[in-house]
């Protein structure tokens, strides 16, 4: 059995982090409109799903070359915005949880087994 190395990313969030700036602006936008009352975790998760569907719709019945990049940017921004707001609701650091997930995936998908294949980790 091969031993997997645990390569771990170091998290280095500065006060000028793009994620922190985006969250600050999103919360300011939300709070100016008194919308926090509607932004409970359930509804934020539903909004992510709906906006993800709208993003998918940009590709429906088209090749990726025919997709409208302007619309893709808008829908992707919505998905990201609701994701950041949901993370904030739970006090989660978006960059930190992304890096944690990458580390988990490194263990599930070692390069020597997963390179060049789309197989799921339990089929490698």
Show the residue positions of the predicted features.
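Flexible "arm" and connector segments at domain edges
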Residues: 2-76, 80-124
């Amino acid at each position: 059995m091969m031993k997997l190395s645990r390569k771990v990313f170091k998290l280095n969030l500065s006060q000028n982090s793009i994620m922190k700036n985006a969250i600050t602006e999103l919360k300011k936008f939300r709070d100016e409109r008194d919308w926090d009352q509607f932004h409970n975790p359930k509804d934020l998760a539903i909004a992510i799903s709906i906006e993800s569907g709208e993003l998918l719709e940009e590709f429906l019945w088209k090749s990726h070359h025919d997709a409208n990049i302007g619309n893709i940017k808008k829908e992707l921004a919505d998905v990201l915005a609701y994701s950041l707001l949901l993370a904030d609701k739970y006090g989660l650091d978006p960059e930190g949880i992304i890096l944690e997930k990458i580390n988990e995936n490194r263990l599930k998908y070692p390069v020597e087994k997963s390179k060049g294949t789309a197989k799921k980790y339990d089929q490698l």
